[in-house]
Amino acid sequence: MARVLVLYYSAYGHIETMAHAVAEGARSAGAEVAVKRVPELVPEDVAKASHFKLDQPAPVATVEELADYDAIIFGAGTRYGTVASQLRNFIDQTGGLWAKGKLVGKVGSAFTSSATQHGGQESTILGLIPTMMHHGMVVVGLPYAFQGQMGVEEVKGGSPYGASTITGGDGSRQPSAVELEAARFQGAHVARIAAKLAD
């Protein structure tokens, strides 16, 4: 049984929702799954004034525990075409793991969100891939076997690089049924590959 970590940062709850869908998919494929978040860097008064969702029950991860999993699925919103600094800050503390090769051969994957259709979803995930490769991870995306990313009948996130959701400029749009389905598919896909590699 593969051990999968869904590691995320979510300011307004969209990525939190996607993270739980990813975890659901991984569990459906037989994985043991932990959902954890990275620490918030924004001062609490600023976060409250900005209406951040601060009541997220997922525990905060430690850098060292990343080595305990067979797969890590990273999730964070897009900030100006790149990953939110909270997740980047956490990842940038993994030098000790890198030096010891602790993540070599583990599966890595990512999902994201943006305010608009062309708000940097692909560039955000692509920006995380070099980090995974420097760690020697096996990168897995969201293949076109997931047919939900085909077609143009509705506004939706998602690409071969990973699942994503579009939040709207005011954050009022929640992940759609097809976006959540994509997240579940990606979680299951990662879990199956991780299980094969762990054998």
Curated annotation (Swiss-Prot):
Q: What is its EC number?
A: 1.6.5.2
Q: Cofactor stoichiometry and binding?
A: Binds 1 FMN per monomer.
What is catalysed by this protein?
a quinone + NADH + H(+) = a quinol + NAD(+); a quinone + NADPH + H(+) = a quinol + NADP(+)
Per its UniProt record, what Pfam families does this chain match? FMN_red (PF03358)
Which residues does the annotation say bind FMN?
10-15, 78-80, 113-119, 134
The Flavodoxin-like domain is annotated at: 4-190
One cellular component term (GO) for this entry is:
membrane
Kindly state which keywords UniProt assigns to this record, in alphabetical order.
Flavoprotein, FMN, NAD, NADP, Nucleotide-binding, Oxidoreductase
A Gene Ontology molecular function term for this protein is:
NAD binding
Chain residues that bind NAD(+): Y12
Q: Which PROSITE patterns does the entry link to?
A: FLAVODOXIN_LIKE
Q: Which cofactor does it need?
A: FMN
Q: Which domain of life is it from?
A: Bacteria
Q: Which HAMAP family match?
A: NQOR
Q: Which NCBIfam families match?
A: flav_wrbA (TIGR01755), PRK03767.1 (NF002999)
Q: What is this protein called?
A: NAD(P)H dehydrogenase (quinone) 1
